[in-house]
Regions:
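Membrane-interfacial hairpin junctions
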Residues: 138-147
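Transmembrane alpha-helical hairpins and terminal membrane-anchor modules
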Residues: 149-166
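Sec-dependent N-terminal signal peptides of Gram-positive bacterial secreted proteins and lipoproteins
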Residues: 2-26
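N-terminal propeptides/leader regions of secreted preproproteins
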Residues: 21-116
Length: 205
């Protein structure tokens, strides 16, 4: 299982944390590719000094953007400069809602929590970069998944039209026959321009 740029959920507990560990060696974690407006893009997740970075490369034009989400400060950096800010709000189930089942899932799923992430970005950022910013706040969801589900055309329009939006993520869990806990995340992206994209689903063991 590959690490993501930011781990907002740990196992079935799934709490946002600030981690401080020993210096890690450079490692390539995951590589995804896509064609956007006739240009080839590659997204590579790397770990440098225990921090996860997303390298988004426009191979056609030989341009690379580096995205890093600092979980503790809530700031997303693009090429070393703050380009987006994340405000997180997490709600946990009460006695009535704890039995809720995901509308996108079969029976057996139990509601865990709902998180809302208000994100902002610099107007006109590339669609590929905006996909990376959105993916940064969704557990177990890669850059390519966001790009393909929302669509490059829609992301380009959103980037040009506004500078902020909301990412809502509803988490569910179920216990498999093996005894392992599987997590499901149903997420929706709503830019301030009014459109709604989703819900889409991602999974994690």
């Amino acid at each position: 299982m590959s690490k993501r740029m930011v781990s907002l959920f740990l196992s079935a507990v799934m709490f946002v944390v600030c981690s401080f560990g020993a210096t890690a060696t450079y490692a390539a974690e995951n590589i995804e590719s896509a064609i956007i407006d006739g240009k080839e893009y590659r997204c590579e997740s790397r770990i440098v000094d225990d921090k996860e970075y997303m390298y988004i490369t426009n191979i056609t034009d030989e341009i690379t953007d580096v995205v890093y989400y600092d979980v503790c400060s809530g700031i997303i950096f693009l090429n070393g400069k703050p380009v987006a800010y994340v405000e997180n709000a997490v709600s946990f189930p009460d006695e009535k809602s704890i039995e809720s089942v995901s509308p996108l899932a079969t029976t057996g799923w139990r509601y865990h929590d709902t998180s809302n992430h208000r994100i902002s970005w610099a107007r006109g950022v590339a669609a590929a970069t905006l996909a990376g910013i959105i993916a940064a706040v969704i557990p177990s969801t890669g850059w390519l998944s966001v790009l393909t589900k929302i669509g490059a055309t829609a992301l380009s329009a959103v980037s040009a039209a506004c500078i902020g939006g909301n990412v809502k993520c509803v988490a569910y869990t179920q216990v498999l026959a093996s005894g392992k806990v599987q997590c499901r995340y149903d997420w929706t992206f709503r830019p301030s321009s009014g459109e709604s994209y989703g819900p889409y689903s991602s999974y994690k063991l």
